[in-house]
Amino acid sequence: FAGCMTLLTPRILLAMERIFKASGEEVWWADKEGGVCCGRPLKLSGETDSARKMMDYNIALFRKHRITTLVTSCPICLKVFREEYHLEGIEVLHHSEYMLRLIRDGRLQLRRGAQTFTYHDPCELGRGSRIYDQPREVIEAVGVLLEPAQTREHALCCGSSVANTAISDAQQLRLARSVAKELSATGAGTIVTACPLCKTASARGAAGREV
């Protein structure tokens, strides 16, 4: 389940396609049958009836295809699926959890190099779902992880959110630049995050740095 923001960040989608192919995983893409959004943006905007219809549609799709594992790249979708969908019999994983499983099972062959990375904990994934270690283990399987000054539960917010209407675009950009500055201070060659919203915001704040 790519979700709205992953569809707007196609490099994530392409990367997941390569990972699925490399691992030999049999995959069904919910997005190709209209399962594009988890329903949270509609719910937060007060469109509760429309949100419920979307959620019911997604559940019907999942049951129709008899899926046993649901993988998403969006921490918001992850939290909504786990807490609001009541998907009995379906395991819901963030892509970092799924990738780590593939690595541990020997289904994804990687070579560790000298490339340096720094990791930004997304609010929804870290503080929201308590997922901190799995993304780091995936990074350390391919290179060297350099932690920023504020990390894990103390990580800075990137400034973007599907519900963030309380601050202006200029304020969002200022927050994104603060995050990018702290991450860049690690000296890492590549900035990594595990949320499509954070990726977009960090790239904007980093002004040309690879994210």
Walk through the language-model features, giving the residues of each.
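Iron-sulfur cluster-binding electron-transfer modules in prokaryotic oxidoreductases
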Residues: 1-211
